[in-house]
Amino acid sequence: MRRKDREVSDLRQQLEIVRRCDSCCIAINDPDQDAPYIVELSFGLEHLEDKDILYVHSAKEGRKLELLAQDPHVSFFMSCGHELVYDAERQMCTMNYESVSGYGIMRLLSAQEALHGLDVLMDHYYPHERRPYHKKAADSTAVYGLEILSMTAKKREKK
Protein backbone atom coordinates (compact mmCIF):
# COMPACT_ATOMS: atom_id res chain seq x y z
CA MET A 1 0.00 0.00 0.00
CA ARG A 2 1.48 3.29 -1.11
CA ARG A 3 -0.11 5.49 1.59
CA LYS A 4 0.91 3.71 4.79
CA ASP A 5 -0.64 6.55 6.83
CA ARG A 6 -4.06 5.44 5.58
CA GLU A 7 -3.57 1.70 6.07
CA VAL A 8 -5.80 -0.11 8.55
CA SER A 9 -3.85 -3.21 9.53
CA ASP A 10 -5.77 -4.31 12.64
CA LEU A 11 -8.22 -7.11 11.73
CA ARG A 12 -10.88 -5.90 14.18
CA GLN A 13 -10.82 -2.44 12.63
CA GLN A 14 -10.97 -3.94 9.13
CA LEU A 15 -14.03 -5.98 10.10
CA GLU A 16 -15.69 -2.88 11.57
CA ILE A 17 -15.26 -1.13 8.22
CA VAL A 18 -16.85 -4.14 6.49
CA ARG A 19 -19.79 -3.92 8.90
CA ARG A 20 -20.30 -0.23 8.03
CA CYS A 21 -20.48 -0.95 4.29
CA ASP A 22 -23.82 -1.71 2.66
CA SER A 23 -22.75 -3.45 -0.55
CA CYS A 24 -19.81 -5.41 -1.90
CA CYS A 25 -18.41 -5.59 -5.44
CA ILE A 26 -17.13 -9.00 -6.49
CA ALA A 27 -14.77 -9.44 -9.45
CA ILE A 28 -15.01 -12.86 -11.09
CA ASN A 29 -12.59 -14.16 -13.72
CA ASP A 30 -14.22 -14.12 -17.19
CA PRO A 31 -11.87 -15.88 -19.62
CA ASP A 32 -14.14 -15.13 -22.59
CA GLN A 33 -13.72 -11.39 -22.10
CA ASP A 34 -10.09 -11.30 -20.90
CA ALA A 35 -11.43 -9.05 -18.15
CA PRO A 36 -13.12 -9.48 -14.80
CA TYR A 37 -16.90 -9.69 -14.55
CA ILE A 38 -17.91 -7.38 -11.70
CA VAL A 39 -21.16 -7.45 -9.76
CA GLU A 40 -22.40 -5.49 -6.77
CA LEU A 41 -24.07 -7.61 -4.10
CA SER A 42 -25.71 -7.45 -0.71
CA PHE A 43 -23.68 -9.34 1.87
CA GLY A 44 -23.34 -10.47 5.44
CA LEU A 45 -20.10 -11.04 7.35
CA GLU A 46 -19.39 -13.90 9.72
CA HIS A 47 -16.20 -13.70 11.78
CA LEU A 48 -15.11 -17.11 12.98
CA GLU A 49 -12.07 -18.00 15.05
CA ASP A 50 -10.09 -19.29 12.08
CA LYS A 51 -11.68 -17.50 9.09
CA ASP A 52 -13.96 -14.76 7.88
CA ILE A 53 -16.80 -15.42 5.45
CA LEU A 54 -18.87 -13.04 3.35
CA TYR A 55 -22.27 -14.49 2.47
CA VAL A 56 -23.92 -13.30 -0.74
CA HIS A 57 -27.03 -14.38 -2.59
CA SER A 58 -28.06 -14.62 -6.21
CA ALA A 59 -30.58 -16.05 -8.60
CA LYS A 60 -29.93 -19.72 -9.30
CA GLU A 61 -28.90 -19.08 -12.90
CA GLY A 62 -26.96 -16.51 -14.87
CA ARG A 63 -23.50 -15.46 -15.99
CA LYS A 64 -22.14 -14.98 -12.47
CA LEU A 65 -22.95 -18.57 -11.48
CA GLU A 66 -21.52 -19.96 -14.72
CA LEU A 67 -18.25 -18.12 -14.16
CA LEU A 68 -18.00 -19.13 -10.50
CA ALA A 69 -18.45 -22.78 -11.49
CA GLN A 70 -15.42 -22.38 -13.79
CA ASP A 71 -13.22 -20.49 -11.32
CA PRO A 72 -14.24 -19.79 -7.71
CA HIS A 73 -11.32 -17.41 -7.04
CA VAL A 74 -12.63 -13.86 -6.72
CA SER A 75 -11.61 -10.41 -5.57
CA PHE A 76 -13.86 -8.09 -3.61
CA PHE A 77 -14.08 -4.39 -2.76
CA MET A 78 -16.35 -2.28 -0.60
CA SER A 79 -16.25 1.28 0.64
CA CYS A 80 -18.23 3.60 2.87
CA GLY A 81 -18.04 6.88 4.77
CA HIS A 82 -17.73 8.97 1.62
CA GLU A 83 -17.52 12.67 2.30
CA LEU A 84 -16.26 15.36 -0.06
CA VAL A 85 -13.88 17.72 1.73
CA TYR A 86 -13.37 21.11 0.09
CA ASP A 87 -10.54 23.42 1.14
CA ALA A 88 -11.76 26.86 0.03
CA GLU A 89 -8.49 28.58 0.88
CA ARG A 90 -6.44 26.23 -1.31
CA GLN A 91 -9.30 25.69 -3.79
CA MET A 92 -8.77 21.93 -3.62
CA CYS A 93 -10.88 18.99 -2.61
CA THR A 94 -10.40 15.44 -1.46
CA MET A 95 -12.58 12.62 -0.20
CA ASN A 96 -12.88 10.99 3.20
CA TYR A 97 -13.62 7.26 2.97
CA GLU A 98 -13.07 3.80 4.38
CA SER A 99 -12.45 0.82 2.10
CA VAL A 100 -11.67 -2.87 2.24
CA SER A 101 -10.43 -5.06 -0.58
CA GLY A 102 -9.21 -8.60 -0.81
CA TYR A 103 -9.59 -11.97 -2.40
CA GLY A 104 -10.89 -15.39 -1.57
CA ILE A 105 -12.76 -18.45 -2.77
CA MET A 106 -16.53 -18.56 -3.38
CA ARG A 107 -18.41 -21.75 -2.64
CA LEU A 108 -22.03 -22.54 -3.41
CA LEU A 109 -23.62 -23.51 -0.09
CA SER A 110 -25.79 -26.52 0.66
CA ALA A 111 -29.45 -25.90 1.52
CA GLN A 112 -28.74 -26.03 5.26
CA GLU A 113 -25.69 -23.76 4.98
CA ALA A 114 -27.67 -21.39 2.75
CA LEU A 115 -30.26 -20.77 5.46
CA HIS A 116 -27.48 -19.84 7.87
CA GLY A 117 -25.90 -17.60 5.22
CA LEU A 118 -29.22 -15.82 4.63
CA ASP A 119 -29.58 -15.28 8.39
CA VAL A 120 -26.11 -13.69 8.52
CA LEU A 121 -26.95 -11.55 5.51
CA MET A 122 -30.23 -10.37 7.04
CA ASP A 123 -28.45 -9.62 10.33
CA HIS A 124 -26.12 -7.26 8.46
CA TYR A 125 -29.04 -5.08 7.37
CA TYR A 126 -31.39 -5.65 10.32
CA PRO A 127 -29.07 -6.28 13.29
CA HIS A 128 -31.62 -5.70 16.04
CA GLU A 129 -34.60 -7.68 14.83
CA ARG A 130 -35.18 -10.95 13.05
CA ARG A 131 -36.80 -10.46 9.65
CA PRO A 132 -38.39 -13.72 8.50
CA TYR A 133 -38.31 -14.66 4.85
CA HIS A 134 -40.52 -17.09 3.00
CA LYS A 135 -39.09 -20.58 2.54
CA LYS A 136 -40.07 -20.45 -1.14
CA ALA A 137 -37.86 -17.37 -1.59
CA ALA A 138 -34.97 -19.12 0.18
CA ASP A 139 -35.42 -22.21 -2.01
CA SER A 140 -35.16 -20.11 -5.18
CA THR A 141 -31.99 -18.33 -4.04
CA ALA A 142 -28.38 -19.42 -4.51
CA VAL A 143 -26.26 -18.53 -1.49
CA TYR A 144 -22.48 -18.41 -1.64
CA GLY A 145 -19.86 -18.20 1.05
CA LEU A 146 -16.76 -16.20 0.19
CA GLU A 147 -13.94 -17.37 2.43
CA ILE A 148 -11.60 -14.41 2.72
CA LEU A 149 -7.97 -15.43 2.16
CA SER A 150 -6.48 -11.92 2.19
CA MET A 151 -7.86 -8.51 3.08
CA THR A 152 -6.48 -4.97 3.29
CA ALA A 153 -8.18 -1.79 4.40
CA LYS A 154 -7.56 1.91 4.38
CA LYS A 155 -9.26 5.12 5.33
CA ARG A 156 -8.91 8.86 5.04
CA GLU A 157 -10.41 10.68 7.98
CA LYS A 158 -11.22 14.28 8.75
CA LYS A 159 -8.21 16.27 9.84
PLM features per residue range, with description:
Residues 1-25:
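Short, basic/aromatic recognition patches
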Residues 1-8, 81-159:
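Charged, gly/pro-rich active-site loop segments
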Residues 11, 61-62:
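Structural motif corresponding to alpha-helix initiation and N-cap regions
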Residues 17, 25, 38, 143-145, ...:
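Conserved hydrophobic/aromatic beta-strand scaffold that supports enzyme active sites
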Residues 18, 67-68, 121:
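A generic structural signal for nonpolar/aromatic side chains embedded in well-ordered alpha-helices
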Residues 21-60, 76:
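Short beta-strand segments
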Residues 23, 38-40, 73, 97, ...:
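Broad gene-expression machinery/nucleic-acid interaction feature
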Residues 63-86, 93:
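Helix-adjacent hinge/juxtasegments
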